[in-house]
Amino acid sequence: MKAKFKILIPEPKSKFIRVKCRQCNNEQVIFSNATFPVRCLSCGAQIVIPKGGKAKIEGDTVRILG
């Protein structure tokens, strides 16, 4: 019989993501479970669309932080 291992310190499934805007190539840090639409700081294009749980990322993912 195999022993089940418990996760001693649970980690969150949400992360911070560095995203590049497709229109102006501006890089911006966003939250993966964003609840509000995120717009690019330089051109104003919408980068993230909230979908209830995980947000839909419209830009290009550069790097996952943390």
Swiss-Prot record:
Required cofactor(s): Zn(2+)
Subunit structure: Part of the 30S ribosomal subunit.
Name of the gene encoding the protein in the UniProt record: rps27e
Binding site for Zn(2+): 21, 24, 40, 43
Taxonomic superkingdom: Archaea
CC annotations in GO: ribonucleoprotein complex; ribosome
Chain ranges of zinc fingers (C4-type): 21-43
Provenance organism: Sulfolobus acidocaldarius (strain ATCC 33909 / DSM 639 / JCM 8929 / NBRC 15157 / NCIMB 11770)
GO BP, sorted A to Z: translation
Alphabetical keyword list: Metal-binding, Ribonucleoprotein, Ribosomal protein, Zinc, Zinc-finger
A Pfam match: Ribosomal_S27e
Coiled coil feature spans: none
Stretches that traverse the bilayer: none
PROSITE patterns named among the record's database cross-references: RIBOSOMAL_S27E (PS01168)
Record protein name field: Small ribosomal subunit protein eS27
Keyword Isomerase: no
Cofactor, how bound (note): Binds 1 zinc ion per subunit.
GO molecular function: structural constituent of ribosome; zinc ion binding
Recorded family membership: Belongs to the eukaryotic ribosomal protein eS27 family.
Signal peptide segment: none
